[in-house]
């Protein structure tokens, strides 16, 4: 049948993509390789820095898919981001953005294999001001928590700061790696924007309040990391000397659960979101079985991704469940 040939004959766990959602997104390099290292970013060995590659690819697709960047840290072998999805198209954005970024990185380092380990990475839905502020701080503190530098400001790669929540825009020139140097295909310059979306400002009351909460979480994380590493950090120069063909050697636990949502201790909200997720998966399973049975007029639940965007099936309008 057509649905088997097109990859919709079976379902693991359907993912729901709702407009107006905050996400923590993590994207790891295959086999923990340092393919995103800022290695020689300021030298003349490469035409573009990894930061430029990230910013161009992100700006290229963010406006198209309604994505706003709130915080980001590009580590040597993974990317941490906090994003706001205005249209429910985060999956499409990540697939397109990550493909362009991976292609440019491969050309930059002459890599023969894949750059990333999964098609679009893992998403963690953030609900509530505490969860959002904590994850933004986590992103900014990542190089310190990894024992690489003593402060976020020392990280030589792409990393955002608390001040960026007030909004910042930079012009990014088109990289020379991989991309067609054609103005119609790839704009010679794009605007990379980062900052708090108006929805976040409404949640926190003001950007200043949001920045204060993030700064508080960030300070605690940095102090804890410095105690844990006893003040011993690799340092900026060792980070810059990292070979893009090398891999991380530190122990990392595999096989753990990947969180799908974070409410930072708000149990009532967590129960509501879990109930919504279960209801969505049940409705999705029913709709998918109807498609497999040959029915043509099938409506999928709100937040359906692939079956709506790729195959054109209609989906319901999202209506939140009442609070418990």
Language-model features: locations:
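Short catalytic/metal-binding and nucleic-acid-binding patches
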Residues: 1-324
